[in-house]
Amino acid sequence: MSKKLVSDLLVDYLERRGVTKLFGLCGHTVIGMLDALSRSKKIEYIGTRHEAVASTAADGYARITHKASVVMCHLGPGLTNVITGVANASLDSIPMVVIAGDVPSYYFGRHPHQEIQMHEDGDQYSMLKPVCKRSWRVDDVEALPYILDKAFRLAEAGR
């Protein structure tokens, strides 16, 4: 039996949570998630041409369904591009969970792809702090279920 990847665990969690749509734009740091989503019978991946469109669509979907929406982006410019839609949802207390891809951990600090060297490596999630209740970087797969539970609870808790 093959070992499950973190992306498979994440999709399994989202399915159990009742997520039926996930908005995003493909990028090199979310290929594993796209692969796992392609095997899901319960979650429809809605690909957009820009991350700002993905976060705005997720905002609209949450407004209609009254459930937390999920947007997925890749690191670097993908993460910066979702901020407008995330901020718009946050200002109106619309529940949204953002999942941002990252390079494989064995590349940390080696500067492949699109690491942003503003203050320190691996701190890109901090860009979302001003426009959302909480942001995390998950470095330990054991913490993933706890962090996901907390993210959805916070998103759905109103202001």
Please state what every model-predicted region is.
Residues 1-159:
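N-terminal alpha/beta PP-like core and its mobile active-site loop of ThDP/TPP-dependent enzymes
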